[in-house]
């Protein structure tokens, strides 16, 4: 919230939070000056449907889609609006993502055919379609490993840490996610 401008809207789509998470939500959503909207909807095995539903809840001109386990670099947040203003023809930005996994072994790396750089980042830059114009022609496709379609022009942000999302998890969560994705 400290990097959010007063006119910015935050829309949280919750598909299965526990009471502890709800207590955190509760601290923020009741203060209308925060401009936070909380919407609940079951995942039902399709990430694109979930993200398209989320898009329908957003009222701004642009959407910055951040997964619950991602944190944007403060430079990225501070410069999004000037980036968009300076490039009026771009409708979609690919954001590089820094993935780190606690407990990752050589066996995991080989099994999943991952690349690890000298900083321990997994598959960097792992660019994700995360900043995009809020319009009906831009929609998410595919139930898992979803992709946006419909943008007339896109651009990649620089593959530098200051333009990244941080995405950290433990190996147990990664293994659980891999099983879920394989089942969809």
Locations of the language-model features?
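Solvent-exposed polar/charged
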Residues: 2, 56-57
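Acidic donor-binding segment of Leloir-type glycosyltransferases
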Residues: 2-40
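Conserved residues at the C-terminal ends of beta-strands
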Residues: 13, 66, 96
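Short, acidic/glycine-rich phosphate-metal binding loop used to engage nucleotide
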Residues: 40-47
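Catalytic-site signature of metal-activated, phosphate-bearing donor transferases
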Residues: 48-55, 73-184
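Short aromatic/hydrophobic "clamp" motif used to bind/position activated sugar donors
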Residues: 63
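The conserved acidic donor/metal-binding loop of glycosyltransferases
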Residues: 67-71
């Amino acid at each position: 919230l400290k990097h959010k401008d007063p006119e910015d809207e935050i829309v949280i789509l919750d598909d299965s939070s526990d009471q502890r998470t709800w207590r955190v939500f509760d601290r923020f959503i009741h203060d209308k000056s925060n401009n936070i909207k909380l919407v609940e909807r079951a995942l039902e095995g399709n990430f694109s449907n979930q993200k398209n539903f989320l898009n329908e809840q957003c009222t701004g001109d642009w959407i910055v889609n951040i997964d619950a386990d991602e944190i944007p670099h403060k430079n990225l947040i501070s410069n999004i609006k000037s980036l968009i203003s300076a490039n009026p023809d771009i409708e979609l930005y690919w954001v590089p993502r820094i993935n780190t996994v606690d407990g990752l072994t050589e066996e995991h790396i080989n099994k999943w055919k991952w690349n690890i750089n000298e900083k321990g980042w997994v598959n960097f830059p792992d660019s994700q379609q995360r900043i995009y114009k809020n319009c009906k022609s831009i929609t998410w496709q595919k139930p898992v490993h979803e992709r946006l379609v419909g943008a007339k022009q896109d651009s990649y942000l620089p593959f530098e840490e200051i333009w990244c999302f941080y995405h950290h998890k433990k190996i147990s969560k990664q293994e659980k996610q891999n099983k879920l994705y394989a089942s969809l």
